[in-house]
Regions:
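Acidic, low-complexity, intrinsically disordered interaction modules
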Residues: 41-101, 108-150
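Short, surface-exposed ligand-recognition loops at beta-strand->loop->(often short) alpha-helix junctions
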Residues: 1-5
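Short edge beta-strands and adjacent turn/loop segments
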Residues: 19-41
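Short, surface-exposed linear segments at secondary-structure transitions and domain or protein termini
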Residues: 150-159
Length: 162
């Protein structure tokens, strides 16, 4: 069975400080589960997830139905600490309200650029009440429907921490 020290060692070997990372390893049913919790919103979640999955994740699939086979799998879950994430979202609420007002006052109904960082852009769509984060190749990364100030704050945070 994998232990938390091994997981942290692999993360550290890839140049990431592990002081604000919590790791829990457990056996649930016939499966091993590795849960990594990031306690800093600026830690690279996708990169850490890729590192841990490459090193430890093992999932067996049925060759015909492609269903996950029971037993012997190791699943990896990486997420931000809920309280820290919500604090960061709440810190973006004022900016989010301003962006929603900006979108509402635009004559453009589809594809209005609200914010950008590097190759990522947040577009607003008044017609479908949607915001989308895409890259410069127009591949959608995330989207929110029936948007409110919290969704906009989450989008702004996702853009900032990308």
């Amino acid at each position: 069975m994998v232990n938390a020290k091994e997981v942290k060692k692999v993360i550290k070997e890839n140049g990431i400080n592990t002081k604000k990372i919590s790791v829990r390893c457990s056996i649930e049913g016939y499966e091993e589960v590795i849960r990594v919790t990031l306690k800093d919103i600026y830690l690279p979640l996708k990169k850490i997830e890729a590192i841990v999955r490459k090193a430890f994740e093992v999932v067996g699939y049925d060759e015909y139905s492609n269903e996950i086979l029971a037993g012997g799998n190791t699943f990896v879950f990486v997420e931000y600490d809920y309280n820290i994430y919500e604090e960061a979202v709440n810190a973006k609420l004022e900016e989010a309200e301003a962006k929603l007002k900006e979108l509402k006052n635009q004559p453009v109904t589809y594809g209005y650029e609200l914010a950008n960082k590097g190759n990522l852009v947040i577009y607003g769509n008044k017609e479908t009440d949607q915001i989308i984060i895409t890259d410069k190749t127009d591949r959608s990364k995330r989207s929110w429907y029936n948007i409110n100030k919290y969704d906009m704050a989450r989008a702004l945070l996702a853009l900032e921490t990308a």
